[in-house]
Curated annotation (Swiss-Prot):
Keywords: Autocatalytic cleavage, Cytoplasm, Hydrolase, Protease, Proteasome, Threonine protease, Zymogen. GO terms for biological process: modification-dependent protein catabolic process; proteasomal protein catabolic process. The keyword Disulfide bond does not apply. It is an enzyme of class 3 (hydrolase). The lineage of its organism: Bacteria, Bacillati, Actinomycetota, Actinomycetes, Frankiales. One of its GO terms (molecular function) is threonine-type endopeptidase activity. The formation of the proteasomal ATPase ARC-20S proteasome complex, likely via the docking of the C-termini of ARC into the intersubunit pockets in the alpha-rings, may trigger opening of the gate for substrate entry. Interconversion between the open-gate and close-gate conformations leads to a dynamic regulation of the 20S proteasome proteolysis activity. It comes from Parafrankia sp. (strain EAN1pec). The 20S proteasome core is composed of 14 alpha and 14 beta subunits that assemble into four stacked heptameric rings, resulting in a barrel-shaped structure. The two inner rings, each composed of seven catalytic beta subunits, are sandwiched by two outer rings, each composed of seven alpha subunits. The catalytic chamber with the active sites is on the inside of the barrel. Has a gated structure, the ends of the cylinder being occluded by the N-termini of the alpha-subunits. Is capped by the proteasome-associated ATPase, ARC. This is Proteasome subunit beta. It catalyses: Cleavage of peptide bonds with very broad specificity. Pfam families: Proteasome (PF00227). The active site is at 53 (nucleophile). Its EC number is 3.4.25.1. Residues 1-52 form a propeptide.
Length: 274
């Protein structure tokens, strides 16, 4: 294969040309075919791809909690029981997705690299608002694929180091961004999770309270939505729960989430109506 630089052992010119601090912009020039939404039209809409389902986020004084169920579905079939849909974005933020699992995972990886690339180039991190805007730009780039059945919607949350509070951002399929001050949920079970959060949310609750109502919202969603997976006590599969505070991002261990699940189930045994 001929060397595009004309000089053996050197990187292509695009790697040596000064540009923006956006990795997505760089990729659009260096290898546009690698962008999630740049695959061109599909011969027919996709209807059988695996889908991730319900994600919730809850703000509390000093931070934010994000939690996601573990189920991926393919039509009426359970495609996977241990999917991880909530991920570290950078030191002070996290991101989850609902929708086409493959596209969602790819979008998350690109977003992580986008934030890391900016920090390496500029020597500083983006503000939380700027991170949310970068993610909106990436969601918009997937609109063509979404119109063909490969839709994915992210939920972004983080600790704002400038204001000292947890913030939540949601998006629609066309990349319209909106900030939610208290709680939000996306995915097939979101209407049930949001109803659960509406009933239990308090503005002054603690981090532990936020963790519990997040897990309980997923439990309620799984109770009414077949595409949302509830806690699997036999396989020891619990929701993914992450917190972001002034101390940064931290994913809770199963040993921490398990007792919360056990407590919820014990309470429901006494009061099946929730």
């Amino acid at each position: 294969m001929p060397d595009p630089t004309g000089v053996a052992g050197r990187l292509p010119a695009v790697f040596m040309t000064p540009g923006t601090s956006s990795f997505t912009d760089f990729l659009s020039v260096a290898a546009p075919d690698l962008l999630p939404g740049a695959r061109g039209p599909l011969p027919a809409p996709v209807t059988d791809a695996a889908h991730g389902t319900t994600i919730v986020a809850v703000a509390f004084p000093g931070g934010v909690i994000m939690a996601g169920d573990r189920r991926a579905t393919q039509g009426h079939m359970i495609a996977q029981r241990d999917v991880e849909k909530v991920h570290h974005a950078d030191e002070f933020s996290c991101v989850g997705y609902a929708g086409t699992a493959g596209v969602g995972a790819e979008l998350i990886r690109l977003f992580q690299v986008e934030l890391e690339h900016y920090e390496k180039i500029e020597g500083s991190t983006l503000s939380l608002d700027a991170k949310a805007n970068r993610l909106a730009f990436m969601v918009k780039g997937n609109l063509g694929m979404a119109m063909q059945g490969l839709a994915v919607i992210p939920l972004f949350a983080g600790f704002d180091t400038e204001t000292g509070e947890g913030r939540i951002f949601s998006y629609d399929i066309a990349a319209a961004k909106s900030e939610e001050r208290t709680y939000e949920s996306i995915g097939s079970g979101s209407v049930f999770a949001r109803g659960s959060l509406k009933k239990r949310y308090r503005a002054n609750h603690s981090q532990d309270d936020a963790i519990r109502i997040s897990v309980e919202a997923l439990y309620d969603a799984a109770d009414d939505d077949s595409a949302t997976g509830g806690p699997d006590l036999i396989r020891k599969l619990y929701p993914i729960v992450a917190s972001v505070t002034v101390d940064g991002y931290r994913r809770l261990t199963d040993d921490e989430v398990g007792p919360v699940v056990d407590s919820i189930i014990a309470d429901r045994a006494q009061n099946s109506g929730g």
